[in-house]
Amino acid sequence: MTVMNLFFRPCQLQMGSGPLELMLKRPTQLTTFMNTRPGGSTQIRFISGNLDPVKRREDRLRKIFSKSRLLTRLNKNPKFSHYFDRLSEAGTVPTLTSFFILHEVTAILPLFLLWWLLYNLDLSDDFKLPNFLNGLMDSCHTAMEKFVGKRYQECLNKNKLILSGTVAYVTVKLLYPVRIFISIWGAPYFGKWLLLPFQKLKHLIKK
């Protein structure tokens, strides 16, 4: 970083009747006015280069919203104002991180919970899902067969384990739109909670 970059910030030069923008930099605490004679006055006003962090977050979010027609419409709807306020408070990075975490959690927890429940039910070996799910059933069955492997053969019924796991996997796949909705809705709330430990740590460091 050069000395010029360190001690100067953006300024606005007012000459005569019209302003002239100069890309100089200077500490935001200082404001200088300079008058010269003859030929009128020259006024130099230094503009702060530090934007409010909240303002920066809102600007980033607006750019993201503007890329989606749906988000733009929802943002303009007063019914969803509370949600978008939460989104602005949480920030972009925590919200996106929260979305991915929730997306995975809403897949893993239902999968293993359904798997356990279905295994403990008396599912027949001839159990079949509707015909239009045959393709999905086959791919999920192959994935479950690889996952189970030989590790559970001694203590559990392998065929029943694979069948119940396959049905659970198919169910979770079908719930994909619901999972997406939950992840989008919960992201700003979870994101704000995710920030708490870092905010506390920052507060302790400042002390």
From Swiss-Prot:
Residues 120-177 are mitochondrial intermembrane. It comes from the Eukaryota. Signal peptide: none annotated. The keyword Transmembrane helix applies. The chain crosses the membrane at residues 99-119, 178-198. InterPro entries: Mrx11 (IPR018811). Residues 47-98, 199-207 are mitochondrial matrix. It holds the Pfam family FLILHELTA. Keywords: Membrane, Mitochondrion, Mitochondrion inner membrane, Transit peptide, Transmembrane, Transmembrane helix. GO terms for cellular component: mitochondrial outer membrane; mitochondrion. Disulfide bonds: none annotated. It is found in: Mitochondrion; Mitochondrion inner membrane. Residues 1-46 form a transit peptide. The keyword Cell wall biogenesis/degradation does not apply. It is a multi-pass membrane protein. Associates with the mitochondrial ribosome. Belongs to the MRX11 family. PANTHER family: MIOREX COMPLEX COMPONENT 11. Component of MIOREX complexes, large expressome-like assemblies of ribosomes with factors involved in all the steps of post-transcriptional gene expression. This is MIOREX complex component 11. It comes from Saccharomyces cerevisiae (strain ATCC 204508 / S288c). The lineage of its organism: Eukaryota, Fungi, Dikarya, Ascomycota, Saccharomycotina.
